[in-house]
Amino acid sequence: MPPTIRNNFPLFHDFVTASHFITQTILMRLSDAMYLEGSTRFENSHREDKPSTTTLVLLHYPKNFDNAHSGHNKHTDIGSLTLLFTPQWGLQLLSPIQKSKSWLWVQPRPGHAVINVGDSLRFLSGKRLKSCLHRVYPTGEVYQEEDRYSIAYFLRPESAANFEDVDGKVVSAKRWHDEKYVTYTEPHEKQDLSNILTGGMDQILA
């Protein structure tokens, strides 16, 4: 265990516990709002006694990227819900309701978190819910000329949960995670050739 985590373990433990409670509560409320029952309720694919790839990530985007390229290429998140804490500019999203189809800045607000729907929840909902297509992008006008930091809690389904992916294939949550994670590591030019990176949302929002 890294010294920073070991020396601050109670802080990390409390943060993860609170993040998990918040995201699970949102899942339950979504299940209620969509009148889901029994095994179709979202929380029943996120049981705490089952293995999953749920994780906490500390993100750092150095200040000296090439402004001609995104700090993080357009993508949707792998899992169900993302609880994101980001006090600095840099996050953009493509709105499913905006006619211009242009990238919108997400204004950082003190005391607030950003919550994204990811691919797994989209698939578990039968694609009734939409994954958030977003990117991290530097700009000299709004983006602050400093290192950018954010904290993301990625709630993901239990690894054995099954759903239909973007191509209609039945896959496990673990398989979707593994295939998409490989795509994250590829050059942007190769990422753009696959619909895995965006979960097919770029075609829907085109």
Swiss-Prot record:
Sites where the protein binds Fe cation: H75, D77, H134
PROSITE patterns reported for this sequence: FE2OG_OXY
Induction field: Expression is highly induced during artificial growth in symbiosis with Populus, which is close to its natural condition.
Cofactor section: Fe(2+)
EC number(s) stated in the UniProt entry for this protein: 1.14.11.76
Domain Fe2OG dioxygenase: 51-157
Involved pathway(s): Secondary metabolite biosynthesis
Positions contributing to 2-oxoglutarate binding: R148
Catalysed reaction equations from the record: L-glutamate + 2-oxoglutarate + O2 = (3R)-3-hydroxy-L-glutamate + succinate + CO2
UniProt keyword annotations, A-Z: Dioxygenase, Iron, Metal-binding, Oxidoreductase
InterPro entries the record matches: IPNS-like_FE2OG_OXY, IPNS-like_sf, Iron_ascorbate_oxido_reductase, Oxoglu/Fe-dep_dioxygenase_dom
Cofactor comment text: Binds 1 Fe(2+) ion per subunit.
GO molecular function, one term: dioxygenase activity
Similarity comment: Belongs to the iron/ascorbate-dependent oxidoreductase family.
Record-linked PANTHER family: 2-OXOGLUTARATE (2OG) AND FE(II)-DEPENDENT OXYGENASE SUPERFAMILY PROTEIN-RELATED
Main function: 2-oxoglutarate-dependent dioxygenase; part of the gene cluster that mediates the biosynthesis of the psychoactive metabolites ibotenic acid and muscimol. The first committed step is glutamate hydroxylation by the 2-oxoglutarate-dependent dioxygenase iboH, and the last step is decarboxylation of ibotenic acid to muscimol by the decarboxylase iboD. The order of the intermediate reactions is somewhat ambiguous. IboA likely activates the carboxylic acid at position 5 to introduce an amide bond, and the flavin monooxygenase iboF generates the N-O bond.
The protein's name in its UniProt record: 2-oxoglutarate-dependent dioxygenase iboH
Species this protein is from: Amanita muscaria (strain Koide BX008)
